[in-house]
Amino acid sequence: MAEIVTCSNCGKRNRLPAAARGMARCAACHIALPWLTSASDGDFEEVVTASSLPVLLDLWAPWCGPCRVVAPGVERAARTLAGRLKAVKVNVDEAPRVAERYGVQGIPTLLILRHGREVARQVGAVPPPALLRWVKEMISKPAA
């Protein structure tokens, strides 16, 4: 699975495979691109655990009102922290094993992961500015 991301610098449309490693860069001008993708039970390991970047994992469901409040903040974090973060959305209705793996009791649940290991958790709706501050703080901490 791949996402098409338009470079904000040069306008080039770039194909970003969900499971790629490293940093997403524009094929034309080489600046860092925002990396927002999705994962399922079947591809979670490749998309998330293998990532060399910290991952903002958004565990959500389409029927969840607070999840819709959080979604713009996740997208904003991916754009603002391009090259420093990979944002991955997981629909818990379609990926129950991922939700079980991280012991998700309520949604939205936001996790910061490094190599698949949880380093921070936020449960419940968070306004976009507060979410961005939280993510910046969590990814700036040295890996344990």
List each model region and its residues:
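Short cysteine-rich clusters marking metal-coordination/redox-active sites
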Residues: C7-C10, C26-C29
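Cys/His-rich microdomains that often coordinate metals
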Residues: N14, A32-L33, A71
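Short linker/helix segments within small regulatory modules
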Residues: L16-A24
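Short Cys/His-rich micro-motifs in 6-15 aa windows
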Residues: A27-T37
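A short beta-strand-turn-helix
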Residues: T37-V55
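Thiol-based oxidoreductase modules, predominantly thioredoxin-like and allied folds used
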Residues: S38-A39, L59, V70-R97
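Short pre-active-site segment immediately N-terminal to redox-active cysteine/selenocysteine motifs
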Residues: S52, L59-W63, G106
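Non-catalytic, surface beta->alpha helical segment in thiol-disulfide oxidoreductase systems
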Residues: G106-I107, L111-A144
